[in-house]
Regions:
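A short, solvent-exposed beta-strand micro-motif common in secreted/extracellular proteins
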Residues: 79-90, 178-190
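Bacterial N-terminal signal peptides
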Residues: 8-16
């Protein structure tokens, strides 16, 4: 979904060879707490330098219950970076903030309340992307970010979840009529990175599949 102006989403991830392994020390943490009295059903956390919202970070099969919380790790290229955040609850209320600043070394917490979920949520049309881990390794981080951003953004597996070999993670993506490209990166328990291109065309339906394969592994330094 295009931010503010229109619904427009498609999916594709761009791969680029790198000489360096993934470094978890580069991640910052953000925690979302639900004090609304209702279930939080979607959270979008998108780099502010992108015009697109990107995937729902909670996932197709999960919600944040009242009184609950979820923490996520975020990857961005600078000491500070701005993100746009939108959340919706089961009653159709919306929390929205733009240009929220994250700073290296400082954990952030956002608490959703009845007071700050005071707007009507937009009418989304969603596609579901099922990502399967077809490697022999446990995927510990999964990033999907709009191609027009310099940041990888948020790890869609949250702070406690992983994607073991053979397992599938379902991701909800708001879609419109246009194609939009995203970058996808997975990192395993060895901090090896897997990247590949993927395009989801809204004209072809609302259900899509992708798999992380051994051949998606980035080459090691010097290869």
């Amino acid at each position: 979904m295009r931010k503010v102006t229109s619904l427009a989403v498609l999916f594709a991830a761009l791969a680029a060879a790198s000489a360096f392994a993934f470094d978890p020390a580069e991640l910052n943490k953000i925690t979302f707490q639900n004090s609304t009295g209702a279930r939080i059903e979607t959270i979008f956390l998108s780099p502010s330098d992108s015009e697109y919202w990107g995937p729902d970070i909670i996932g197709a099969d999960f919600v944040i219950k009242d009184g609950g919380s979820l923490g996520y790790y975020i990857h961005y290229p600078e000491k500070t970076f701005k993100f746009d955040i939108m959340a919706t609850d089961e009653a159709g209320h919306m929390f929205e903030v733009y240009n929220y600043v994250l700073t290296d070394g400082k954990e952030s917490t956002i608490t959703f309340t009845q007071k700050n979920l005071n707007s009507k949520a937009p009418e989304f049309t969603f596609a579901t992307l099922k990502v399967t881990n077809n490697t022999d390794h446990e995927v510990q981080y999964l990033f999907i970010s709009p191609e027009d951003s310099d940041a990888w953004g948020v790890d869609l597996l949250d702070e406690e979840s992983t994607l073991t070999a053979g397992d599938t993670h379902s991701i909800v993506i708001p879609i419109g009529k246009d194609k939009v490209t995203y970058n996808l990166m997975a990192a395993d328990e060895n901090n090896d990175e897997y990247v590949f291109d993927l395009t989801i065309d809204p004209a072809k339906g609302k259900d899509f599949k992708a798999s992380i394969e051994a051949e998606d592994l980035k080459p090691a330094k010097g290869e």
